[in-house]
Amino acid sequence: MRIVLLFLVVYSSIGYAQNSKVLIVGDSWAQQQYSDQVHDAVFDVNGYPDIQVLRNGDSDAVAIDGTTAADWVVPSELAKITDALINNPSVDTVQLTLGGNDFLNNWNTAMSVGQVNALKTTIVSDLQTIVEAILAVDMNIEIILSFYDYPNFEETTNDPWEFTCRDLHDDMLNPTPTEINSMALDFTNAFVAIANQNPKIFYVQHWGRMQNAYGWPDQGIQPGDIALPGDYTLTSPLEAMRTHLGFVKDCFHLEPEGYDILVQGLYDEYYRYRFDTIYKSHFE
C-alpha cells in the first residue's frame, strides 16, 4: 500500500510539473493574481483544466508586492526569473506585470516633459532588459505583457485609515483622474512598444475593464455601457477596488472578482490562441 501511495504522489507531482505552463512575474498585480489563483480557475472554466500556473518556491520568488522594473534588473533578482524558467522547463509562457510602481513612485504633476520622457525611457529600458533575459532562456518562450486598469484615488483618500493611498496621491501632487489616467496611458503605450518589436512578446490592454464590467448603476451607467478602453476622465468603480481588513478600499488594486475579469480578458485575447495552437491536441 505504501508503494502504491508513493507512486500516486510521484505521478501526481510529475503530472503537475508537466502541466505548469505559465509563470507569473512582477509586482503586486502579479502577486495578487497569483495568490488569488485566478488563472487556474479561468483556464478550467474555458476548457483547459490541465494547464496551470507554476506554483512552487521558484514562482513564489518572482511575484512580489511593491517591486519595480528597476528592482528586477538587479542581477541577483533577474537571476530569480531565469532560474525559475531553467528549473521548470515545462513553463513556456511568462506573464509580466511591471512598471506601475516605477510610475507611481516617481511621477508627479510638476514634472517637465523632459523629466517625464526620461522616466519613461528608464522604465522601458528596464523592461527591455527583463524580457531579453527571459527570452534568452528558451526560444520557445512567449511573454504576455499585462499591465493595469484605472486607479481610484477619488474615493479612497478621505478617511483617516486611508493614509496609504492619500500619501501616494499627495506625493504625485494630487492629480485628477484625467491627469493620472492620461499619463498612465502614455507610459503604457511606451511599454507596449516592446511587444511591437518582437514576435515573441504580446500585449493585452486592460484599461476600462472595471468601468465596463461594473459601471455606476446608481448614476444610470449600467455594466457594459462604457466600452473598452473606458473613459480616462473617470476612475475605476469603487466596487472593483480591493478591500482590506473588511472595510478599507484600495486605490489601485482589484478585488479577486476584478482580476477574474482581467484574466478572462487575457484568455480571450491571448491564452486561448496560445493553448489552441500548442496544447489542444495533447489534451483531446
Sequence positions of predicted segments:
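Short hydrophobic segments within beta-strands
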Residues: 25-26, 146
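Substrate-gating cap/lid alpha-helix
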Residues: 153-207
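Conserved SGNH/GDSL esterase-like catalytic core that processes O-acyl groups on lipids
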Residues: 19-23, 29-122
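A short helix->loop->beta-strand "cap" motif at the edges of active sites that frequently abuts
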Residues: 137-142
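A solvent-exposed, charged loop/short amphipathic helix patch at secondary-structure junctions
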Residues: 104-122, 157-179, 242-244
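Residue-level recognition of alpha-helix boundary/capping or hinge positions
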Residues: 19-21, 29-32, 177-178, 182, ...
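Histidine-centered active-site loop/cap adjacent to the catalytic His
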Residues: 228-276
